[in-house]
Amino acid sequence: MVNLAIDSYARATLEVDDGGILSVNYTCDVPVGSGLGTTGAINVALLAAIEGMAELGDAERQTVAEQAFQFESLLGNKGGRQDQWAAAHGGWNHLLFIGDDVEKMPFSPIRSAQRWLGKHLVLANTGIPHVSGDLHAMIWERYAAGDEQVREGLMAIRMAARLMANGLQQDRRDEVITAFNEVCRGVDLLDPGLHGPFHSVVDPLLEARNVLGWKALGAGGGGCLVLLANMGRRELVEAACEAAGWTLLEWDIDSEGVSVNAS
């Protein structure tokens, strides 16, 4: 899994009044259900505030990420761990999942590749809400039953992550584009309906070569997506998104991850 933390934030505050009454509040810059990992980020912020972590080294970030994942699971929204890890660590992440263990792989995209993505990657919100746990449930049932199509789709997504990581570290833009397309193929194998809300807008952009690759964010089925615009075509892509009623979101990389301020 390759992911990136961006500068849309979840914030949590914990206060204890003079009578010892504790109150916790949280907010987020983007809607829950948008596919941007908002639930994971909110829970990382919430648990970091409750823990009152004075130091946030790598071990502490891993701890709060896992606590946030387990908290979500208890609430019945069990998905992957990637959103919590991205929120806790910030920046670029290349994650390997082995059972319940998460291994953070060495990963450092070169600046030219990051500048290229910053210039050409369009982030849009369709405004169609989804619940990732609900979307995942049927897929995992099929996986548990030995569905070969689901297994093939998951393998395609896993191999695409390796290709994406290599492409970003070596500025192999052809590999980045191929990785986007392989992820889409893998998702279609899991459930073609996950891409359903996007096709009417995205397919014409692909056919016209205005877009070279794209990806539904989160579980798909609505929420946000990213589109990799061809050189000189970003304005055309943005215009198509806005014509469809989608909201364009400005983004930049957040390299800090979770932080705690005590006062």
Task: Name each region found by the language model.
Residues 222:
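Glycine-rich active-site/cofactor-binding loop and its immediate structural neighborhood
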Residues 3, 10-15, 27, 31-32, ...:
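C-terminal nucleotide
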Residues 61-65:
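Alpha-helical scaffolds flanking conserved acidic
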Residues 36-58:
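DPxDG-like acidic metal-binding loop motif
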Residues 17-19:
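Contiguous domain-boundary segments centered on the initiation and propagation of an alpha-helix
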